[in-house]
Amino acid sequence: MIDRICISLNNRCNLNCSYCHFHEKGTMDDAPMDVLEILRNVKEYAGHSFKIGFVGNGEPLLDFPMLKDCLRFLEDSPLIQVYTITNGTIPLSDEDIRFLEQHRVNVGFSLDGYQELHDQNRCNSFGQVMRNVQKYRDVTGHYPTFNATVGEESLLNRERVISFFEPFGTRVTFSRMIGKHGIPLEEYR
């Protein structure tokens, strides 16, 4: 039974992280996709708990108006849970953060750990991400979840990485690297 889908709202990102494998092919097909039609089908056929992730080939918050349209469309579907993962560099207004909270969106910030580790692959964005994490907490009263990409450096410093995340008291998903600096995609299967 299918219980989740991931939807990429775009193929654009405001960063160029050294380990990102989504843009290795050079040009990405940015053919239009009717996201609302996909959501219409999910609403019609998912008669059970269902997860929708707005993640993938780009930074979803670059298309925040489209994300808001999708969330409004799903307002009458309490069995559908929504999450998104952002690189954390797009500043959101208090109103936008409250909108995400009111629509029960689990917002995950991509954060690889302490500053030196994060900045090593994520374009020196640690300070900006942490400001947005703090703003999210100030508005919602809780920290977002985190998604950390695991590579050799984080494995060599795992205690430091874990110690970095512990004070937040929230869920951290550790994802392995695929592509240039991780295992080849062919070996992942």
Residue ranges and their predicted role:
Residues 181-189:
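A C-terminal junction/extension of Radical SAM enzymes
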Residues 15-19, 117, 183-184:
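Short acidic/His/Gly/Ser-rich catalytic and metal-binding motifs that mark active-site loops
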Residues 9, 57-58:
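Short acidic donor-binding/metal-coordinating loop in glycosyltransferase active sites
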Residues 4, 58-62:
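Short coil/turn segments at secondary-structure boundaries
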Residues 35-55, 63-181:
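Radical SAM/AdoMet-radical enzyme domain recognition
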Residues 1-35:
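Canonical Radical SAM [4Fe-4S] cluster-binding loop centered on the CxxxCxxC motif
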Residues 26-29, 58, 119-122:
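The substrate-binding groove and active-site-proximal loops of carbohydrate-active enzymes
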